[in-house]
Regions:
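Strand-loop microenvironment adjacent to phosphate/nucleotide-handling motifs in alpha/beta enzyme folds
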Residues: 35, 40-42, 193, 197-214, ...
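Conserved Rossmann-fold NAD(P)-dependent oxidoreductase catalytic core, especially the SDR/UDP-sugar
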Residues: 12-13, 123, 129, 133-192, ...
Length: 416
């Protein structure tokens, strides 16, 4: 779909060529452009070798694009999927010149020997860790795979990075790590725990950046809704009251780079995601962008919450809200550190690994033992499919929702 850049042209006859522009996910978020301290970002990227895991993905590729603006000595694009990574490398060479120092490396974070080989060969100074299994319902069906990749892949990467003298490690986290109801979010919470553990016990500066949904990324709602509209509908949403925090891909990547420059090791940085967006409103607006009218000539169908899904996400725990601290950037806050019993944590990790390697449903119980705030919204059926355990028919208490959202917004304002 294309938008008319100047609505006044509607009354002046046929718009001229160039009067239209492509739909941008930012059209759905009414807020100012992110302001960056580029000197701070340059200070740790310029002239350095930078490794981006998951570099061919939506966020990883945008990180690579923006890192190139700061003239790194070398950019390493690490991904298990060769096609997207190769296309990104070609894009960067077309933009910056065929002789730029960009290397595409194929491998898995689950393969520690491959990681050691990469670190020994290229000696990166900075690591951005964007590789992960992120699809919430799919990870409910394959919880052991989520654990192997997200938890132990991250542990492999942290271990190899620390052993090979990496200066700075930036982990991409998610609001789904807060009071998780799904396996993916729970694994990301454990990754935050790993970050703080390595920050405390190694010389490497480690930090995580927690943010919400990214508009336009693989599997996000706008591409899904667009495809459904092009196919004649229906447009499907899981619950009429479901809300989410959103950022555009460039916004998220810019703030990740900025948070990486703050360099307070062990920090969990929380991004100000602005006001939450009701998914029903998003679907309605997009349907109208395409010239249809919701539930007149384009049906909106409510399908019920998917396994692991919840009605609204939170950017911080209740225990974090009163202790959030501000940073030099007005859109980045710091969550208070977790108290982690190192011996108990590593014992729980061993138990989790055992369950994951046996593809045991017991992995979900192990996750619950490790993350006390994890309350799974899943039930395994007799045919081995997984369904949401609750929430499909309930109506959200709008007063409670608004109270929760107001408290989060107030906390961010107070921190400023």
């Amino acid at each position: 779909v294309q938008l008319l850049s100047d609505p006044q042209l509607v009354g002046s006859g046929a718009p001229q060529q160039g009067a239209f522009r492509e739909l941008n996910p930012a059209d759905f978020l009414s807020r100012d452009e992110v302001t960056l301290d580029t000197d701070q970002i340059s200070s740790y990227l310029t002239g350095k070798t930078v490794l981006v895991t998951g570099g061919g993905g939506s966020i990883g590729s945008e990180l690579c694009r923006q890192i190139m603006r700061y003239r790194p000595r070398q950019l390493l694009i690490f991904d298990i999927y060769e096609n997207c990574a190769y296309e990104l490398e070609m894009e960067l060479r077309n933009k910056y010149g065929a002789d730029i120092n960009v290397v595409t490396l194929i491998g898995s974070i689950r393969d520690i020997k491959r990681l050691d080989e990469v670190f020994e060969t290229y000696h990166p100074s900075v690591v951005f860790h964007a590789a992960a299994h992120k699809h919430v319902p799919l990870m409910e069906v394959s919880p052991a795979e989520a654990v192997k990749n997200n938890v132990f892949g991250t542990k492999n990467l942290l271990t190899s990075a620390a052993e090979h003298g990496v200066e700075r490690f930036v982990q991409l986290s998610t609001d789904k790590a807060v009071n998780p109801t799904n396996v993916m979010g729970c694994t990301k919470r454990i990754c935050e725990m790993l970050i703080q553990t390595f920050a405390k016990n190694t010389s490497m500066k480690c930090m995580a950046v927690r943010f919400g949904n990214v508009l336009g990324s693989h599997g996000s709602v706008i591409p899904l809704f667009e495809e459904q509209i092009k196919n004649g509908g229906p447009v499907t949403i899981t619950h009429p009251d479901i809300v989410r925090y959103f950022m555009t891909i460039p916004e998220a990547a810019q703030l990740v780079l900025q948070a990486g420059g703050l360099a307070q090791s062990g920090s969990i940085y929380v991004l100000d995601m602005g006001e939450p967006v009701k998914i029903m409103d998003l679907a309605t607006r997009l349907i109208r962008f395409y010239g249809y009218e919701p539930n007149v000539n384009m049906e909106i169908k409510v399908t019920g919450l998917r396994p692991g899904e919840k009605l609204y996400e939170e950017l911080m725990l209740d225990s974090e809200q009163d202790r959030m601290t501000k940073t030099a950037h007005d859109k980045i806050f710091i969550a208070p550190p977790m108290q982690i019993d190192l011996a108990a944590f590593y014992e729980e990790l061993q138990n989790l690994r055992h369950d994951a390697e046996h593809n045991d449903e017991g992995v979900v119980l192990s996750l619950q033992r490790m993350v006390g705030t994890y309350h799974p919204n899943r039930v395994v059926n007799e045919d081995h499919t997984v369904s949401a355990a609750h929430g499909n028919t309930e109506t959200i208490d709008k007063e409670e929702l608004q109270k929760a959202l107001d408290e989060q917004h107030s906390t961010q304002q107070n921190a400023q």
